[in-house]
């Protein structure tokens, strides 16, 4: 009898406001680290705190867009503020993938996870390419310059 292998769960988090090619490349690279990709979308309040602006799209819409991407298996909306360790525990990831532009110190995050009994590996995904086409703030800037003269 063949032993069933445990599926490797990869967790990512982010704002994912105005989806662009950089997001898709990040999600694809993260999915390649395991079998299932779970995404936690930043709560609108978290976006306001981190970005100091309103989200362009509400969290529910951002979550729905992410659910439509073939690399993504599950999507949750985070709680306002900081990382919801209880949600991370319920997801039970084997790997947490950090985006190239996310301001997390991987070692400190690993320590914080361990304090909560979460033993996931933390991996930073490198830039596939760095381009203004793959940066939400630059996309917003181009829209403003093009349509708000």
Swiss-Prot record:
Keywords per UniProt: ATP-binding, FAD, Flavoprotein, FMN, Nucleotide-binding, Nucleotidyltransferase, Transferase
Enzyme class: transferase
GO biological process, one term: FAD biosynthetic process
Enzyme Commission number(s) of this protein: 2.7.7.2
Entries under HAMAP family matching the protein: FAD_synth_arch
Free-text function comment from the UniProt entry: Catalyzes the transfer of the AMP portion of ATP to flavin mononucleotide (FMN) to produce flavin adenine dinucleotide (FAD) coenzyme.
Assembly and interaction partners: Homodimer.
Protein name, UniProt field: FAD synthase
Organism: Thermococcus kodakarensis (strain ATCC BAA-918 / JCM 12380 / KOD1) (Pyrococcus kodakaraensis (strain KOD1))
Taxonomy of the source species: Archaea, Methanobacteriati, Methanobacteriota, Thermococci, Thermococcales
Gene: ribL
């Amino acid at each position: 009898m063949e032993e069933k292998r445990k599926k490797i769960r990869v967790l990512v988090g982010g704002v994912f406001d105005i989806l662009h090619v950089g997001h898709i490349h990040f999600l694809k690279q993260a999915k390649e680290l395991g079998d299932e990709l779970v995404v936690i979308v930043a709560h609108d309040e978290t976006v306001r705190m981190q970005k100091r602006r309103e989200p362009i799209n509400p969290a529910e819409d951002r979550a729905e867009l992410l659910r439509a991407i073939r690399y993504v298996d599950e999507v949750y909306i985070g709680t306002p503020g900081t990382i919801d360790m209880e949600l991370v525990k319920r997801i039970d990831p084997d790997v947490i993938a950090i985006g190239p532009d996310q301001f997390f110190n991987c070692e400190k995050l690993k320590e914080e996870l361990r304090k909560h009994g979460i033993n996931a590996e933390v991996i930073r995904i490198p830039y596939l390419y760095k381009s203004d086409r793959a940066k939400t703030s630059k996309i917003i800037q181009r829209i403003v310059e093009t349509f708000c003269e």
